[in-house]
Amino acid sequence: MHIRMVGTGSAFAKKFDNNNALLEQDGCCLLIDCGITLPKALYQMGLAFPEIDAVLISHIHADHVGGLEEFAFQMMFKYNRKPVLFIADTLIEPLWEHTLRGGLTQDPLNKLEHFFDVRPIIANTETELFPGLRVKLLPTKHIPNKPSYSFLFNDRFFYSADMRFDKELLLRLADGGVQTIFHDCQLEEPGVVHASLNELLTLPESVQKKTWLMHYGDTIDQYQGRTGHMRIVEPQRRYEV
């Protein structure tokens, strides 16, 4: 299993594009989140939407779903395909009603299912996405009263998406066999809706060595050598996980 970050930036970062990723397993390509900058960033990588087999959404914020309108329109009108959308059952209605409906609706096309092959996922239940690729959606805290999910792939790779620091969860995952953690990281205090670097630095050395930092701000270069045993994910670089 390999991952390439299309972007590694925080919601307000201007240098690194939205924190979205391509996860590859046995010839299948899963897009993890589809933010505002995703269409352009994907193009700059020399890739196009038809090369994506499915998209998996973590929560409803523009840097994670803001590119879905263009994705849907391109696939429908340019490529005559309905892309597969893996999504928590709790996110289906808010994604359509609060984010996509205004831009995508053109009668008689007025449902999410008109644009995507919607595959609902129930949280905390392991689901096979492709042969050899399984995911478990873990409800995590990000914004109060707003559902948000992190992803556990094949019981060994944890992808936080956006979440507040949860030391207990990270220790439990590491003890349970997780080998690699890609975690969002807010560089400056306080970490209100994301884990801060200082919070992540409280993790044991053994867990830090498994942890890679993503979803960071434009000042990340100032933090080189200041991240303990954790490493910084580089955009567009391919990692085995």
From Swiss-Prot:
The protein's matches in SUPFAM superfamilies, at most eight in alphabetical order, are given as: Metallo-hydrolase/oxidoreductase
UniProt cross-references to InterPro entries, sorted A to Z: Anti-Pycsar_Apyc1, Metallo-B-lactamas, RibonucZ/Hydroxyglut_hydro
The answer to whether keyword Metal-binding applies is yes
Molecular function via GO: hydrolase activity; metal ion binding
Q: Where does Zn(2+) 1 bind?
A: D63, H64, D162, H215
Q: Offer one Pfam family short name for this entry.
A: Anti-Pycsar_Apyc1
Q: Can you state which reaction this protein catalyses?
A: 3',5'-cyclic CMP + H2O = CMP + H(+); 3',5'-cyclic UMP + H2O = UMP + H(+)
Q: What is this protein called?
A: Anti-Pycsar protein Apyc1
For this protein's source organism, the top of the classification is: Bacteria, Bacillati, Bacillota, Bacilli, Bacillales
